[in-house]
Curated annotation (Swiss-Prot):
Compartments reported by the entry: Cytoplasm
EC assignment: 6.3.4.19
Domain comment in the entry: The N-terminal region contains the highly conserved SGGXDS motif, predicted to be a P-loop motif involved in ATP binding.
Reactions catalysed: cytidine(34) in tRNA(Ile2) + L-lysine + ATP = lysidine(34) in tRNA(Ile2) + AMP + diphosphate + H(+)
Organism: Lactobacillus johnsonii (strain CNCM I-12250 / La1 / NCC 533)
Keyword set includes Cytoplasm: yes
Identification of the protein by name: tRNA(Ile)-lysidine synthase
Keyword Phosphoprotein: no
A family per Pfam: ATP_bind_3
One GO-annotated biological process of the protein: tRNA modification
Function: Ligates lysine onto the cytidine present at position 34 of the AUA codon-specific tRNA(Ile) that contains the anticodon CAU, in an ATP-dependent manner. Cytidine is converted to lysidine, thus changing the amino acid specificity of the tRNA from methionine to isoleucine.
Length: 431
């Protein structure tokens, strides 16, 4: 049994009546994978689709298209092609944008032809380079496991069946099977860190051991296991909720974590919600302090923790606005509706007040007071503190006024004055 067939059995990949989408470039790796799939699948003409995106980044990129047309025609498999329009090329960050456009193209092809699997030709040398790149750039172990052999892209499973093959093995496979391919000439330049690692560092490491690809796979599998153990631990903790412009959780829910585990927990939450890698240092849960890291702020207030992405904080408009009952309105990036009726949407709160067609809404100014049931006034900041809402989030709590009096403050206050003629207003939030 070859490494190729072993990949499918070890990962329980079903073959019968399944459709495969191969991302091909015309290079030696994807050409080898194409040939392996044609030899492996029971009915490649019906089961296999080859997708090729011409990035139009080189004058000779059309040669790859010509090669794939000849090859797929000879092998009797379908080829789907598209060009990345030059006018969409960015001035900077071309590689990231190209990848984004490529995977959007592949996802679209997958949906159109209802393919079950997407296969890419990443191999063991790519894995080694990825590990070294992440080690140099961040040292984050989780990032070193970015090239997983089985993943997901939309409704398709993403498969990388060549990760246990070295580049040399694939070149030998191409030679043995008399396969033509095109080498991207930019791969031979030293202008990128990946290329410099490929040309100068990886060959030295291979001289030290003949098991470098095997060891890289073992490292990747170990990291995947450790990452799963960590995510299982963090997912077993009570999940924070979306609160105003933050994630909010109870400090007691994570009290058993030590300072390093707490830092990793908040790194995990940020990546899970915002897909951004952030690395907090030690986090002491017993101190009511604020931690700032890049565009994120972590703060502890009263019995809660709050995780805020400052990029999502809208500019506060100090002006109140008039809204009509039963009509949706926007406040600080969220949609609300005030009505006397019951709705299926999430109820943000309710209050009692005089019957009216219009209400004033806005952000409660600092220094405001709120009327108690006794008729006395209390400082609004006291009510915010009682409800564990920190200063940074208070302007984002929706306030409703009637006759210049606040009658509702989201998550904080509702009119306490009793009047038999008052009616109930429900405040709904739309996500």
């Amino acid at each position: 049994m070859t490494k190729f067939t072993t990949f499918f059995t070890e990962n329980n990949i079903e073959i019968k009546n399944k459709k495969f989408l191969l991302a091909a470039s015309g290079g030696p790796d994807s050409v080898a994978l194409l040939k392996m799939l044609v030899n492996f699948l029971p009915n490649p003409s019906e089961q296999l689709i080859v997708a090729h995106l011409d990035h139009c980044l080189r004058d000779d990129s059309f040669l790859e298209s010509q090669l794939l047309q000849r090859l797929t025609s000879a092998l009797k498999v379908k080829l789907v092609e598209k060009k990345w329009p030059v006018e969409l090329h960015p001035q900077a960050g071309v590689e990231a944008k190209a990848r984004e456009y490529r995977y959007a193209f592949l996802a679209k092809v997958g949906r159109k032809y209802q393919t079950d699997y997407l296969l890419t030709a990443h191999h063991g040398d790519d894995l080694i380079e990825n590990i070294l790149l992440k080690f140099i750039r961040s040292g984050d172990v989780a990032e070193m496991n970015s090239l997983q052999i089985v993943g997901n892209l939309g409704s398709m499973k993403l498969l990388r069946p060549l990760v246990k093959y070295s580049k040399d093995e694939l070149l030998k496979y191409d030679k043995d099977h008399h396969l033509d391919f095109i080498e991207d000439k930019t791969n031979f330049e030293d202008d990128t860190l990946r290329n410099r690692l490929r040309h100068h560092v990886v060959p030295l490491l291979k001289k030290e051991t003949s098991h470098l690809v095997k060891n890289a796979n073992h490292f990747s599998e170990s990291v995947a296991l450790l990452s799963k153990c960590q995510s299982d631990l963090f997912d077993s903790l009570p999940s924070p909720i979306n609160f105003s412009k933050a994630l909010r959780g109870k400090k007691e829910d994570i009290a058993r974590l030590n300072t390093h585990e707490a830092a990793a927990f908040f790194d995990y939450l940020i990546y899970k919600k915002w897909h951004q890698r952030i690395h907090f240092d030690e986090i002491d849960l017993n101190k009511n302090v604020i931690f700032n890291k890049e565009n994120f702020q972590l703060l502890f207030y009263q019995k809660y923790y709050y995780l805020i992405n400052r990029n999502e904080l809208a500019v506060i408009d100090p002006k109140r606005k008039l809204v009509k009952l039963n009509e949706k309105f926007s406040f600080n990036g969220k949609k609300y509706l005030i009505t006397q009726d019951e709705k299926s949407q999430k109820l943000a709160g309710y209050f009692y007040g005089e019957k009216a067609k219009y209400l004033e809404v806005g952000s409660l100014p600092q220094g405001s007071t709120l009327k108690l049931a006794t008729g006395k006034q209390t400082k609004a900041k006291k009510k915010f503190a009682e409800n564990g809402i920190p200063l940074a989030l208070r302007p984002y709590c929706l306030t409703v006024w009637q006759e210049e009096n606040p009658v509702y403050v989201e998550s904080v206050y509702q009119n306490q004055e009793y009047n038999p003629n008052f009616i109930r207003y429900n405040v709904y939030i739309y996500f």
